[in-house]
């Protein structure tokens, strides 16, 4: 019986260190800019992470989100950050990454508007709104405007109806120091 308990304990410890090692290696690939290698490593270790505790899973999903943000695959980044949040990662770790995702989405949407790819810009601006619905209402308005420019009137109407439902008026108060 003692051997069985000892064997189980050793197996658990080695399994836990393998998870952390894979996560560390993927993080090294990320910091060196080898995003595809990091994703491949995380994907190949998916079974290891699936059987791990929520803390390791949330760290893996946070890394997935960071990788997809860097690769401008914004929908997958949003999904990864959402899963990480649901698994209980701290807001202190998650909020800076969500801010980076917002910035990347806005920059990409502005680029799409400049190249007259209004449909893509509308979707990206809607994603910015979805990230923080309380503070990013104006981006939903911009998304609706981009949808109008892309001649996607049903989508624009949907966005304008959401704006009406949340009673968005577009009025801002700005304070100036004189």
Predicted regions and their residues:
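Alpha-helical repeat scaffolds
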Residues: 42, 76-83, 120-126, 155-164
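TPR alpha-solenoid repeat register
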Residues: 60, 94, 138-139, 172-175
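N-terminal leader/linker segments that initiate helical-solenoid repeat arrays
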Residues: 6, 17-103, 114-115
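Residue signature of alpha-solenoid helical repeat architecture, marking inter-repeat boundaries
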Residues: 55, 99-100, 134, 170, ...
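Short coil turns that delineate tetratricopeptide repeat
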Residues: 50, 89, 133-134, 168
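Structural register within alpha-helical repeat arrays
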Residues: 25, 64, 101, 108, ...
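Conserved structural position within tetratricopeptide repeats
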Residues: 47, 86, 129-130, 162-165
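Sec-dependent N-terminal signal peptides
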Residues: 4-13
